[in-house]
Amino acid sequence: MINLKLLLVLTPVIFSVAFTDYWLRRWGVFVWDNGPTIQNQQVWEDTAIVADKGRPSDGYPVFTVRTLAVNALGIPSVFFLGAIFAMQFIRRGVINA
């Protein structure tokens, strides 16, 4: 039972790390040329929201404190809400919970 509890606690952390790593690689922030490097600037040319005037020449930062907050707080919160939702379907006697 302890292994199941440990898995339930670590699953949101593993998903957070995996999804953060995936998107930062896809955006080009994590680059593996000769070694792992971090390029924390991205030029978003294809968006209509960003104005042409006043834009930094090397782009905007991708990996910020907000990125950490969304991934570190948002993803485990979804798992927590899912667990609460799943508890509504556990009946005593059917599943030994």
Curated annotation (Swiss-Prot):
Topology term for the membrane: Multi-pass membrane protein
UniProt-recorded Gene Ontology molecular function terms: heme binding
Any GO BP annotation: photosynthetic electron transport chain
Presence of the UniProt keyword tRNA processing in the record: no
Keywords: Membrane, Transmembrane, Transmembrane helix
Record-linked Pfam families: Cytochrom_B559 (PF00283)
Transmembrane regions listed in the UniProt entry: 4-24, 70-90
Compartments where located: Membrane
One GO cellular component, as annotated: photosystem II reaction center
Function recorded in the entry: Unknown. Resembles PsbF, one of the subunits of the photosystem II reaction center. However, it encodes asparagine rather than histidine at the site PsbF uses to bind heme.
NCBIfam families per UniProt: cyt_b559_beta, PRK02561.1-1
Family from the record: Belongs to the PsbE/PsbF family.
Name assigned to this protein: PsbF-like protein
Organism in which the protein naturally occurs: Prochlorococcus marinus (strain NATL2A)
Lineage of the species this protein comes from: Bacteria, Bacillati, Cyanobacteriota, Cyanophyceae, Synechococcales
